[in-house]
């Protein structure tokens, strides 16, 4: 019985263990002044794929007019991005770990394929998160505005989705009360 109780306790602890964001996320977050767990949770939402039984952000991800595309290499992703740009309005194309929008953030990169550099993409995503955050407010509100600066229901849906990733990374559970409170605070 004692062994069973110990095993159950270990399983419960493992289910809520904190996941440390990889060093690249920590560095980009530190430079921008945002929590690394927030940046990592956003990347999980934006470009996450299942690999070896875990969800991980994928650097060579594109979203073109609502359709997700994953590539094996940066070169393949760049070719896919260039092809998409010939036929799709740039405001309908997102690229990289943080799914940076080509049209709305064109001032942040020199060449569209720069967004497929994981370090550059994370730096831009962290900058956007920082710009959307107001001192003293919950980071979930900034997360919603990262997705949709105008707020509203699309931002609230995005917040709810990212909050699940954030809770996993932080080793906590998202509570219904917290999600409702975040929803009520949003414009």
Model features per residue range: what roles?
Residues 18-175, 187:
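Catalytic glycan-binding domains that act on GlcNAc-containing polysaccharides
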Residues 181-187:
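Acidic, Ser/Thr-rich low-complexity intrinsically disordered segments
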Residues 12-14:
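N-terminal signal peptide c-region/cleavage motif recognized by signal peptidases
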Residues 1-7:
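Sec-dependent signal peptide recognition
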């Amino acid at each position: 019985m004692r062994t069973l109780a110990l095993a159950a306790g270990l399983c419960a602890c493992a289910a809520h263990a904190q996941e440390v964001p990889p060093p690249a996320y920590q560095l980009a977050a530190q430079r921008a002044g945002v929590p690394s767990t927030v940046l990592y949770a956003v990347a999980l939402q934006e470009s996450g794929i299942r690999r070896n039984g875990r969800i991980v952000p994928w650097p060579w991800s594109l979203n073109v007019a609502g359709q997700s595309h994953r590539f094996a290499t940066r070169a393949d992703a760049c070719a896919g991005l260039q092809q998409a740009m010939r036929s799709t309005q740039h405001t309908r194309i997102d690229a990289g770990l943080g799914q940076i929008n080509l049209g709305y953030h064109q001032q942040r990169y020199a060449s569209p394929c720069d967004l497929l550099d994981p370090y550059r993409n994370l730096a831009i995503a962290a900058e956007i998160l920082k710009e959307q955050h107001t001192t003293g407010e919950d980071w979930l509100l900034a997360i919603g505005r990262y997705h949709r600066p105008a707020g509203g229901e699309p931002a609230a849906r995005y917040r709810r989705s990212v909050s699940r990733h954030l809770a996993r990374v932080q080793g906590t559970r998202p509570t219904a009360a917290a999600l409702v409170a975040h929803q009520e605070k949003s414009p």
